[in-house]
A protein has these predicted regions:
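An alpha-helical, amphipathic repeat domain used for nucleic-acid recognition
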Residues: 1-134
């Protein structure tokens, strides 16, 4: 049994040394994947924490995201609205009816109240322009 544990430790240390296992690379690639799916920075942070990634790597990853795009949460929220067909993607007559529900959906996905309000206040034309850029 001890031989097996030693063998596992040797294999793991070899994989870490050759960078096949790395919290840094995992956090960067997973964050990139989650951003493409429209996740907020808070949701990404909580996901990485739940996976046991070290805080320093999470901080580096979040800083890199903010460095690349200062308002990443806004664009991620726009992607989420498109994906779930909420907020500005609703028809104009339905938007006031679903305002609170849509704010709640955005909040549960980790977006701040200010970001959620900015999204909900977008006109249909502005929303479509932003979507065409993404």
């Amino acid at each position: 049994k001890n031989d097996l544990v030693e063998l596992i430790d040797i294999v793991l240390s070899d994989l870490e040394k050759n960078k096949f296992i790395s919290d840094k690379y995992y956090s960067e690639s997973k964050a990139k994947n989650l951003i493409q799916r429209g996740s907020s920075i808070n949701k990404i942070r909580n996901y990485l924490l739940s996976k046991g990634v070290q805080s320093k790597y999470i901080k580096e990853t979040i800083d890199k995201i903010k460095e690349n795009n200062d308002d990443q949460d806004f664009f991620s929220a726009v992607k989420l609205c498109k994906k779930k067909r909420i907020g500005p993607s609703r028809t104009d007559e339905n938007r006031p009816l679903f305002y609170k529900k849509d704010i709640g959906i955005l909040a549960r996905n980790g977006f701040s109240f200010e970001t959620s309000q900015r999204i909900m206040d977008l006109s249909k034309d502005d929303y479509n322009k932003i979507i065409s850029l993404l």
